[in-house]
From Swiss-Prot:
FAD binds at residues 13-18. Its main location: cytoplasm. It comes from Treponema denticola (strain ATCC 35405 / DSM 14222 / CIP 103919 / JCM 8153 / KCTC 15104). GO terms for molecular function: flavin adenine dinucleotide binding. It is found in: Cytoplasm. This is tRNA uridine 5-carboxymethylaminomethyl modification enzyme MnmG.
Length: 628
């Protein structure tokens, strides 16, 4: 083995988690090494060529507010924009874009190459070496020392972030065919999963999948419905004022009874049902054969046709993820009229891979078994680019802070942790480390109890100053936030001062019930639109649509936000009551056996976190509260 020079932080994997982790650590001034099999695959949109969605779009904006890259990459590569749930309340609205997958990956690679504190080495990591390792490889409270690669290199570091995606012991399935790949045609990283298990980590397997891709010219769009999109593209990144990009169309069609019959006749040939796949899949992203089996009463399922980019003729067939053999895939898709003469360029396939149970992590995404080892992304049992990116930036921040604490003895390691009332990222990580996973974890607005406070448009208000304080965000971003808040307050003050007169009602009849009130008061009426307010306030033309909408929401929902803030304040005491890392649960008399077992397994950091562990009795939480 040849030992290379020391680094502060090593990041393994250049997917969405690895990119954010590596860039965050490097931008905080640490010397970072990113190890990946091939840099050309950096930031690959392996499945759906889209970024964002319900709650996922909020995470992208949170990553950006923290100083991450995903929002900027999405802005620079978007080819369609939609604000989802526009007809519903702001707490569940979120942006989603179609992205040019090749441009996105190219820009991600370039961002990595431009970062001055970041080096890249293209190889496969097969082991993490730590202190306190016995002869059998088991580790009891060790510390990271170095990583080993497949080609015999060793790299030392103070902290290591593992962001392996579907590549750790990955295997793809197409009917009877199987291959040790992380993606079709890209070999898996073999060796690291068993190495982690040998050290004492609980390692399992999860499953995901992707649909076929087809050639555009073999598809008849006239037999489909065009999917509506927003006319104006809006940015994810708070650093971008507006977006001007070419637009691409998406389409909707449906399966039919003939499609379903072919699938039913061949279920025994699907890897998902033949016993080949051992990993558990996400119930919220089922394969087409899973849909047919679970919902036999349905006579059709939606299929979305989405472009993979502006300079490719391949289309992504959203809704037809499958592990069926290629001959069955070809027959089933041709039963849909618009695909009668289809040419499949890449088959659908399933992939299962190794993951590490996340209840073995602390809230900073550091493993409790090996100090200085952080995990992010699908290795923690999550699904989705956005979830991976959100974990990646937190792992990268904490790896940098941990490294600093070892370099500078007067700098104590204080983990950067986002709470459930601060960010969707905080909700996700708390769910992972407190409850673990038994299927790929996907973020939903329903998981967040304080979602009105976690709107996508407020991500900068919640997170930018915190990121600036640790050296990740820029002074420019901090100043931009201050300017936004000052301007919004100015708009709100103006609307509070403008009174509604009879003359104004003549031109704006929707204000007829608000004579004598201010424009701000009128906004509490759901029948009064922002457009009506702006028609009266001539100064509104000087402000961006985003800023005006932000002012509107602050006024319209101020009472609901106040109620939510009171609820947050009530639970703060439990969230702030720390449980010592070495707390002896066996010494607590009266604690139920089930609660004692779960508490010892999860090792919650606060009483609040303990209360969210599955199987913990309220009486046991009360007992711990009294003791602490």
């Amino acid at each position: 083995m040849y030992r290379f020079s020391d680094y502060d932080v090593i990041v393994v994997g250049a997917g969405h988690a690895g990119i954010e982790a590596a860039l965050a650590s490097a931008r905080m001034g640490e010397a970072v090494l990113l190890i990946t099999q091939t840099l050309d695959s950096a930031g690959r949109l392996s499945c759906n060529p889209s970024i964002g969605g319900i709650s996922k779009g909020n995470i992208v904006r949170e990553i950006d507010a923290l100083g991450g890259e995903m929002g900027k990459l999405a802005d620079a590569s978007m080819i369609q924009y939609r604000l989802l749930n526009k007809s519903r309340g702001p707490a569940v609205q979120a942006p989603r874009v179609q992205a040019d997958k090749f441009l996105y990956s190219q820009l991600a690679k370039h961002a990595i190459e431009l970062e001055k504190n970041l080096h890249v080495f293209q190889d496969t990591v097969i082991d993490i070496v730590s202190s306190n390792t016995n002869e059998s490889g088991y580790v009891e409270k060790g510390s990271v020392q170095y990583v080993k690669t497949e080609r015999g290199r060793e790299f030392s570091a103070k902290a290591v972030v593992l962001a392996t995606g579907t590549f750790m012991e990955g295997k793809i399935y197409i009917g009877e065919y199987e291959s040790p790949d992380g993606r079709l045609g890209e070999r898996a990283a073999i060796g690291l999963g068993p190495a982690l298990a040998k050290k004492g980590f609980t390692v399992g397997r999860l499953k995901t999948g992707t649909p076929m891709r087809i050639l555009r010219r073999s598809f008849d769009s006239s037999l489909t419905e065009e999917q509506e999109a927003d006319e104006i593209m809006r940015p994810f990144s708070f650093s971008n004022a507006e977006i001007h990009r070419p637009y691409a169309k998406c389409y909707i069609t449906h399966t039919n009874q003939e499609t379903h019959d072919i699938i039913r006749e061949n279920l025994h040939r699907a890897a998902l049902f033949s016993g080949k796949i051992t990993g558990t899949g996400a119930r919220y992203c089922p394969s087409i054969e899973d849909k047919i089996k679970k919902f036999p009463e349905r006579d059709r399922h939606h299929v979305y046709i989405e472009p993979e980019g502006l300079n490719t003729e391949e289309l992504y067939i959203n809704g037809l993820s499958s592990s069926l053999p290629e001959d069955v895939q070809d027959r089933m898709i041709r039963t849909i009229p618009c695909f009668k003469d289809v040419i499949i360029t890449r088959p659908a396939y399933a992939v299962d891979y190794a993951y590490v149970s996340p209840i073995q992590l602390s809230s900073d995404l550091q493993t409790r078994r090996i100090e200085g080892l952080f995990l992010a992304g699908q290795i923690n049992g999550t699904s989705g680019y956005e979830e991976a990116g959100g974990q990646g930036i937190i792992a990268g921040i904490n790896a940098a802070l941990f490294s600093r604490s070892l370099k500078f003895k007067d700098e104590k390691y204080v983990p950067f942790v986002l709470k459930r009332d601060e960010a969707y990222i905080g909700v996700m990580i708390d769910d992972l480390v407190t409850q673990g996973v038994d299927e790929p974890y996907r973020m939903f607005t329903a998981r967040a109890e304080y979602r009105l406070n976690l709107r996508h448009d407020t991500a900068d208000e919640r997170l930018t100053e915190r990121a600036y304080q640790i050296g990740l965000q820029t002074k420019e971003a901090s100043n931009r936030l201050k300017e936004k808040l000052l301007t919004r307050e100015k708009i709100i003050s103006l609307w509070k001062d403008i009174k509604i007169t009879r003359d104004l009602i003549a031109k704006n009849p929707e204000l007829k019930n608000h004579i004598g009130k201010s424009l701000a008061d009128a906004l509490h009426d759901p029948q009064v639109s922002l457009e009506c307010i702006c028609a009266i306030d001539e100064n509104s033309k000087d402000y961006s649509a985003e800023l005006l909408e932000s002012a509107e929401l602050e006024i319209r929902y101020e009472h609901y936000i106040a109620v939510q803030n009171r609820k947050i304040a009530k639970v703060k005491r439990m969230e702030n009551t720390k449980i010592p890392a070495d707390f002896d649960y066996d010494a607590v008399s009266g604690l139920s056996t089930e609660s004692r077992t779960r508490l010892k397994e999860v090792r919650p950091e606060t009483i609040g976190q303990a209360s969210r562990i599955r199987g913990i009795r309220p009486s046991d939480i009360m007992l711990l509260s009294i003791l602490l």
